[in-house]
Amino acid sequence: MTVIQSSTVIDVQNASYCIVIYASGNWRSLSLPNGIGILGRWSLLCSIDLELRPSDRHNTPPVAIMISPRFIPVGISQTIIVPTMDADNDQVRCRFANTTAECASVCPPNSLPIGTIMFPNCTLLITGSNVADWYAVAIVIEDFIDSTASLPLSTIPVQFLINVQQKSSCPYRPLLTGPTTSSDQCIGIKVGTSFNIELIAENFCPNSTIIKDIAILSFRFLTKTPIVQNTTALWSVLLTWTPAAVQVGSQILCAIAIDSDNVQSNQYCMSFIVAVERVPSCPGQIIPTTVDPTTLTTADYITSTIADSTTPTTVDYTTASEYTDEYVLSI
């Protein structure tokens, strides 16, 4: 499975600040809020500050993406990290969406199980209540000029689905790795330069279990080969990408391996900075795929009572482009 981002370019002139809202429906049938069923609407709000920074250049908003849906086993607390990147190296914080314009029918706390936590470092802790439950997660990513700032420079929504599944008989999930040693590394790349990425999925379960897919959430101009079994335990795909001029700025690629028991691997992500003239340096980094307990503070908690029902839609998120005066609304 490969999910491609689509973009709408909006030319903003003679404005210092603007808000872009995309609202429609419907989500697929959801388990929460109680009784929502197939009536869930979505709304995504992106705020854009067009005033010059102290460096006399426009702000570059953060980029964030998520593979959707994410499968989690019932009754087991799960940690899900939302990969983010900010080309200005601003402080990036995450929170739950909290207004009708930001989340429509799926605003927390009623849209998620009790005890769900969203930490400012973009770490989500969630425990699925019932097998076959579907939840829509509505998160807002914001960048701040420094750690003391309270007003964000921009607001970027990320919305994705979670599906609760029966526990697998095998206690191990697949491991997905790539060319970088960890997902907090950034790669500079020049427009027109071909770049190959081999993703390798390892199976730790009995031989009856296989890796059936390596799913990718990618940008344009990227190709993917069919999945290949290399050994009894290893499968791989090869990605090839030649960035175009329209991709100048920050890009994030994410992937997940899925085995024949429908168990998902870790989400593996790579971040890129694209430039026209030369290979650029990387001023920002994406959130690491390991959790530092010392950073899990001042979280958003879900403490309301809940019930259940059924299922949601596709990955929906909004980003604004980088290094230009145009902003791109990606859904």
How should these model regions be labeled?
Residues 143, 259, 277-331:
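Extracellular mucin-like PTS segments
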Residues 1-288:
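Long, compositionally biased, intrinsically disordered segments
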